[in-house]
């Protein structure tokens, strides 16, 4: 028993030496807080946006400026100098630190200095991403199609599905659904996107309301995953429900806010959340574009989230485009 106790103490001591405890930055002392779930990280981003929520007429540019105030350091090593970070966090699932700054310019300067201090460590400003204008414009017509199809469902369900989404028929998904009519299993598909229209009749019995969530910075909670503006997530989830048997449920993971903005970090949180809540499949038909000014290796964070998902046995489906 004594040996086990000593071994535990030694292991704990080694872990504590790796995790950051505090940093001193330009006269500031910043305690490092541990964040153990994607929801906890989302809450930090939500609090960061507090002043923005009080403003009227918040734009996508405003949201993107807030995102650029964050710096990601992919290391558990204690930082001797954060160059002015007002808050420092360590996300245990992803194994990286999140530094918050008063301005995007301060964050950019900090990245330059931190890269000099820690060569070989992946350090970058959080990356704003936006839903493509083409996707947003096209979804207005898609929503009309969905609504028309739902109203005609009583006439002929199979015919309606094909009329609403020709792609389902082209890919043979309508036949697959018919072949699976006697399937006795179940599955949950996490749709990481702009949310979902929770009141749409197609989702009445197909939505996993317990685990659907909003991780976007404009709201929190299980009841905030509704998609009132964009429609893209509703479109994607509609295709899933109409191409699969009733045993397949949708877990709506909202990562885009009302302006159509998200961050690379928030999207990776969506992947972690889906894995932690036992999604069988993750769907990311996001149709977003990375704004200019970022290096290609900044996307490693997403690759690492995918690796965690695959290790957990979760299937990840990512769209490459609509062509």
Q: Which residues does each PLM region occupy?
A:
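Autoinhibitory propeptides
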Residues: 14, 61-63, 77-167, 178-179
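Solvent-exposed loop/turn segments at secondary-structure junctions
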Residues: 105, 127-131, 194-198, 246, ...
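Substrate-binding/access-modulating region of protease and related hydrolase catalytic domains
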Residues: 256-323
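Positively charged n-region of N-terminal signal peptides that target proteins for export
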Residues: 1-7
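Hydrophobic core
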Residues: 10-18
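Sec-dependent signal peptide cleavage junction
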Residues: 18-29
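Structural detector of well-ordered beta-strand residues that form the stable sheet scaffold
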Residues: 124, 251, 315-317
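Active-site core segment of subtilase-fold serine proteases
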Residues: 154-250, 269, 276-277, 281, ...
